[in-house]
A protein has these predicted regions:
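N-terminal assembly/interaction segments in proteins that build large macromolecular machines
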Residues: 1-185
């Protein structure tokens, strides 16, 4: 594909020579319209957009291109999101949901046992709160036992369908946030 006085390959090679870094072009697209504009946020070549319009309006085009860059989409719509991204997001959502469900069960069990969960949410807090006299060594031992027991029991008995439903909801929210056509004003 020609570009200026050479090809795109020539431009990539020239740029590699300037920066001293190996560069590769893994793909390209042609953007066509009656008027095409670009936006390069702060001139840093990190957050850029190219937008084509059906008629020329420099101010509107600049504002739209800038807004698209600010929205930072990864695709136009859900169909454009790579399956690998969706799979990674669903796995993150599943793990996060499981951790939250276990944490909720632990906090409920601690409260039921008469222990404030915020006093025993980490080893540092346990030591600090014992030094302040807010909890006793017996409370810490009881809390550690509750945390270990409830965590293991809850993790082993999480309802899979509930986890999947919550994870799917999180994936839907993610897609709404990263797909240009799904983002809200």
């Amino acid at each position: 594909l020609s570009m200026g006085k050479g090809t795109i390959q020539d431009a990539v090679t020239d740029r590699s020579g300037i920066t001293g870094e190996k560069m590769e072009l893994d793909g390209y697209n042609v953007v066509e319209g009656a008027y095409t504009t670009t936006y390069n946020h702060m001139g840093k070549n990190q957050l850029c957009t190219i937008v084509a319009f059906n008629k020329e309006s420099e101010e509107v085009a600049h504002n739209v291109a800038m807004q698209i860059a600010a929205m930072n989409p990864i695709a136009i719509d859900e169909a454009g999101v790579p399956e690998s991204v969706k799979e990674q997001e669903i796995q993150v959502a599943i793990e996060k949901t499981k951790a939250e469900q276990v944490q909720k069960a632990v906090e409920a069990a601690l409260k039921k046992g008469g222990i404030n969960p915020t006093h025993v949410d980490s080893e540092d807090h346990m030591e600090s709160n014992m030094a302040k006299g807010w909890i006793t060594a017996e409370d810490v031992a009881k809390a550690k036992d509750i945390i270990a027991t409830v965590s293991a029991e809850k993790a082993a008995n999480l309802p899979e369908q509930m986890i999947q439903n919550i994870a799917q909801g999180r994936l839907s929210k993610f897609l709404k946030e990263v797909c240009l056509l799904n983002q809200e004003d």
